[in-house]
Amino acid sequence: MKLLVILLFSGLITGFRSDSSSSLPPKLLLVSFDGFRADYLKNYEFPHLQNFIKEGVLVEHVKNVFITKTFPNHYSIVTGLYEESHGIVANSMYDAVTKKHFSDSNDKDPFWWNEAVPIWVTNQLQENRSSAAAMWPGTDVPIHDTISSYFMNYNSSVSFEERLNNITMWLNNSNPPVTFATLYWEEPDASGHKYGPEDKENMSRVLKKIDDLIGDLVQRLKMLGLWENLNVIITSDHGMTQCSQDRLINLDSCIDHSYYTLIDLSPVAAILPKINRTEVYNKLKNCSPHMNVYLKEDIPNRFYYQHNDRIQPIILVADEGWTIVLNESSQKLGDHGYDNSLPSMHPFLAAHGPAFHKGYKHSTINIVDIYPMMCHILGLKPHPNNGTFGHTKCLLVDQWCINLPEAIAIVIGSLLVLTMLTCLIIIMQNRLSVPRPFSRLQLQEDDDDPLIG
């Protein structure tokens, strides 16, 4: 009974808090540090990020989508869709119908992005709201004829400080107000490719810089008076795994390059056959024991990577740490793109703000779950998506959430309370029961004679 009262009272308080703050427009800043592997948090020191986490929430592993590349996963974060659904299926793509090509240097055609509606477009279309972006993939493209009110054209030479200055200026002073903003930074991905994630000396230096940037971000938000009312999510698109020159898969040793066109290379190679598809497949399937070769229709269902015309007829997937090359060596000591079930491919998520609990840790969510959570925070109606809002409820202060250990504890506690109450009721009933009054045995008149003569 006491437990029920407490739960009801907590619900009323939560509801009151939610209602009392509803007059303030919710604001959300989404930050991505490209290639931030989840276990970097355990293997390196991050004083600024750990302070951020102590005052907010941490999701230790975010299971991203296959293929675990930059453009596809950044679009999954903001649409809640698998790659086959939102259409950005790789960093390099080819559309057989239009004959168009997509790459990181040729990504401005809305054709590639229009199969989905990212959250900044949905937010931008609301009354008295606007969106802002500092180089998040796709934000400098007019998607469904809509672009953010404030954005920066992508230029990797622009410093983090300049990007941060613009984003905080737009969040602090714009009309209509910026209620959703994104900020993207290329590290630690670039250094992860160069050194490999197991290079402690170099990665320690790089990750310290990342932590300092997070400290700068928090300090700037506090200085501008944005910190207490702004929801901030820090996450990434993928992790990184160690590669080496002795783990190469040379396609030229297996098949003549004139038999196919290579759309995307490693570690997931997209093959467009120029001759009979089956013949190309048969030549490739025995190329290496460290590479899986799939016809498009045979790609495992768990990848959600079949139902899009931009996915090529044959897909090659290298084992973790192996690199697919064309008769040449690889300069990369780190890479990503591999099977999304691998922990090395997973990023993390940390969040702080009025929408989030404080000091809460959660083991895992899916990257597509971030989108419905962000829509909830901003009060937006989400477009159809592959995410599950229930997976993120435990992170949010306005949601009642219970996990399995807590459920077991509540059941056991409830049974103990009920048992104690039952015992108390029985004891009280026994104490309060009225005893029968004492009375002498009444004898009949003829019973006055003695029984023994």
From Swiss-Prot:
Amino-acid positions noted as binding Zn(2+) 2 in the UniProt annotation, renumbered to this chain: D189, H193, H336
Residues annotated as glycosylated: N155, N166, N276, N386
Record Pfam families: Phosphodiest (PF01663)
Extracellular face residues: 16-407
Gene Ontology MF term list: bis(5'-adenosyl)-triphosphatase activity; metal ion binding
Transmembrane segments: 408-428
Cysteines paired by S-S bonds: C254-C287, C394-C401
Mode of membrane association: Single-pass type I membrane protein
Gene3D superfamilies hit by this protein: 3.30.1360.180, Alkaline Phosphatase, subunit A
Enzyme Commission number(s) from the entry: 3.6.1.29
Annotated residues for binding of substrate: N91, Y154, D189
InterPro entries: Alkaline_phosphatase_core_sf, Phosphodiest/P_Trfase
Catalytic activity, reaction form: P(1),P(3)-bis(5'-adenosyl) triphosphate + H2O = AMP + ADP + 2 H(+)
Cofactor note: Binds 2 Zn(2+) ions per subunit.
Source domain of life: Eukaryota
One GO CC annotation: extracellular exosome
Residues of the signal peptide: 1-15
Function: Hydrolyzes extracellular Ap3A into AMP and ADP, and Ap4A into AMP and ATP. Ap3A and Ap4A are diadenosine polyphosphates thought to induce proliferation of vascular smooth muscle cells. Acts as a procoagulant, mediating platelet aggregation at the site of nascent thrombus via release of ADP from Ap3A and activation of ADP receptors.
Entry protein name: Bis(5'-adenosyl)-triphosphatase ENPP4
Source organism: Homo sapiens (Human)
Source organism phylogeny: Eukaryota, Metazoa, Chordata, Craniata, Vertebrata
